[in-house]
A protein has these predicted regions:
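N-terminal export leaders
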Residues: 7-25
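Mature extracytoplasmic/periplasmic domains
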Residues: 37, 315-393
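Early extracytoplasmic/lumenal segment of secretory-pathway proteins
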Residues: 38-107
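Extracytoplasmic ligand-binding site segments that recognize negatively charged/polar headgroups
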Residues: 53, 105, 110-266
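Alpha-to-beta junction loops
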Residues: 87-95, 109, 201-203, 273-278
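Extracytoplasmic/periplasmic substrate-binding proteins
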Residues: 256-319, 356-359, 363
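Conserved C-terminal helix/tail region of periplasmic/extracytoplasmic solute-binding proteins
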Residues: 383-427
């Protein structure tokens, strides 16, 4: 998914990253005695996470509906994982990505979450439980969320091989990433990951400069070329890392890459200007380019997508009223408004049934069912992003999520990867 704080803005909303708690508004909540519920309204929860979901609009709506104040702080993925581990008393709720759970949860800073307290647990998509959205779908290589979703018990730090009553995070958001292209400038159909390094696009392609994600895009490209076959792209051996980095360095020396971007806005600017015609990209960045009236496609590719997901965890130190408020917040989060809000940006929500109730049939048809828009599609800030008759790139939910080939990961050789990636960066 992300890095760099301004770099993590994978969304179109102006002023979307939350910097502070929201104090206005209130609303009734249910499920607690009156006095208890009134006390919960006085609770402030400190949450940190990436810019994908650390959004003022979510905190504001939560305050309006539940009375709970959420103080949000946005940061990049690596900083979020580091804070979770090294400053466990500085937050109450951790909004982190699943691939970082391999680092964070064994540090004993988050508490296993009781699924019996999650109102919509049974409605959470199976991707986070069994790993498959359909019986025939593959789970994909790397740190698929289901591999780190559960622990063996209430006090356990050991990941469970199958669903238990204790989750590491309650899932909230996920997506399938691919290459972004300028169809008006590439001059031919784009069908494969190997097109990223086609000499025809020399000096006009770009790759994300985040080791854990860029290496995946490179691996998808090399397998597409037929020059490498990985045992597990999400957990490479040192020789596999060496070969992948050597490939990237050679392509860099050949002048293939125009840029190595870290931020959402960088990727938008590169594509909007036409400096780059094919690159690693995020769905809302494609939307941002389109909102300028410029053709841009989030291109489905034959080899599949790279997946990522995130969720909410509760700090180990949280107890009593504050912990109950955190569970209430999570239950509110899954109740539909937030899911619809995220879906409208091109992400997917963990509980589809409640999100659907907060979307129009036209919105649901466009974003989820792969149907042509019957009216203009607008983002949460009102920007028109699709016209009547337009289709979402990649088709339906099942077409996209069912074709994830690998997931963002923390490799066993992560430190070695970062070292080698730095060699590529300065080459």
């Amino acid at each position: 998914m992300t890095q760099k704080a301004d770099a993590t803005r994978r969304f179109l909303l102006k002023g979307g990253i939350a910097a502070a708690g929201v104090a206005a508004g209130s609303g009734a909540i249910t499920g607690f005695p009156t006095i208890w519920a009134q006390n919960i309204k006085n609770v402030t929860l400190r949450q940190f996470g990436t810019g994908v979901s650390a959004l003022n609009a979510i905190a504001s709506k939560c305050k309006e509906d539940t009375g709970i104040t959420i103080q949000m702080t946005a940061m990049d993925t690596d900083a979020a994982a580091q804070r979770a581990i090294t400053q466990p008393r500085s937050y109450d709720v951790a909004d982190i990505e699943y691939f970082t759970v391999k680092k964070v949860f064994p540090a004993n800073v988050l508490q296993p979450l009781d699924v019996k307290k999650i109102k919509f647990y049974d409605d959470i998509v199976p991707l986070f439980k069994t790993g498959k959205v359909t019986p025939t779908a593959s789970i994909g290589q790397g740190t698929a969320p289901c591999r780190v979703s559960f622990v063996e018990g209430e006090t356990s730090l050991k990941f469970a091989g199958a669903p238990t009553e204790w989750m590491t995070l309650i899932p909230t958001i996920y997506n399938a990433d691919t290459l972004g292209i300028r169809p008006d400038l590439v001059g031919r159909p784009i069908k494969n990951w190997r097109d990223l390094v086609d000499p025809a696009f020399k000096g006009k392609s770009a790759i994300i400069n985040i080791p854990s994600i860029g290496i995946m895009d490179a691996a998808m490209t090399m397998e597409s070329l037929g020059t490498m076959k990985y045992g597990d792209k999400g957990n490479m051996t040192k020789p596999e890392i060496d070969q992948t980095i050597a490939f990237l360095i050679q392509k860099k020396k050949d002048g293939q890459f125009r840029a190595f971007w870290k931020s959402f806005q960088e990727s938008v600017d590169l594509m909007s200007s036409g400096e780059v015609v094919i690159q690693s990209m995020w769905s809302p960045a494609v939307t941002a380019v389109r909102s300028k009236g410029i053709q841009c496609v989030f291109q489905p590719l034959a080899e599949g997508y790279r997946g990522w997901g995130g969720g909410l965890g509760i700090a180990k130190h949280l107890t009593g009223l504050e912990r109950d408020a955190a569970y209430e917040y999570i239950n509110w989060y899954l109740s539909g408004w937030t899911g619809a809000y995220l879906n409208r940006q091109g992400y997917y929500s963990a509980v589809l049934s409640t999100a659907q109730k907060n979307m129009t049939p036209n919105e649901w048809g466009y974003w989820m069912d792969g149907k042509p828009a019957t009216a203009a599609i607008v983002s949460p800030d009102g920007t028109e992003i699709a016209k009547v008759g337009d289709l979402r790139d990649g088709g339906s939910y099942y077409d996209r999520i069912g074709k994830i080939a690998c997931w963002n990961s923390v490799m066993d050789n992560d430190r070695y990867l970062v070292q080698k990636w730095n060699e590529f960066s300065v080459a």
